[in-house]
Amino acid sequence: MAERKPVESWLTDMDGVLIHEGVPIPGADAFLKKLRDSGRPFLVLTNNSIYTPRDLHARLSRMGLDVPVENIWTSALATAQFLADQRPGGSAYVIGEAGLTTALHDVGYILTDHDPDFVILGETRTYSFEALTKAVRLINGGARFIATNPDNVGPSAEGDLPATGSVAALITAATGKKPYFVGKPNPLMMRAGLNAIGAHSESSAMIGDRMDTDVLAGLEAGMRTFLVLTGVTQPKDVDRYPFRPSEVVDSIADLVDLV
């Protein structure tokens, strides 16, 4: 078996790896500082489409974590780039927040509820029956169904929240149409992120806390994968999957010396 190349570029998930319930995970600051000091290409990825990179930069800064705006890659950005490639200057009906609508505006998309090319479902905390009904009718009328990410639940201080995947399932039940999910574990999001920083999969690593999104996305993109145990996955969970990460570590602190 060919020896793996040293890791030259890093992609890391945010929730469960760098932060947990709004608090930095020990080692996150040291890891990010070493990345910045080394000059190695890196991205912080998130399937959450609510916030813009500028919003996330500000939130992380308030926690004491310095991540430049250009080093943040969201499922909203990946979705906008995908749609700009698929249908430049197209139109969309959007259920989502500023992170998604801003990304679509930035690639020249028209947001409308009149005969759109696409219905795009993203993360929001204010899903309305009216908006979901409109989405169902537009999809039944021929609009193509896109969703930013397949996560069924998202974290909060009070416990799990229903997320994009759960709401997409509702729309699928009403229309018979399944969405195309752009975010992790779709390797499309990973490859677009790698391209954005000029990195190559064979010399890059993905760090995550979820087997079903982070590790799977890294594997399918041909990257080395590190599973941390500071998020949703526990050691006993790993054997439930037919694939394994390259390494399992306790936390991001264990990876500082690899940068």
Report each predicted region and the residues it spans.
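Asp-based, Mg2+/Mn2+-dependent phosphohydrolase catalytic module
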Residues: 2-40, 49-73, 77-259
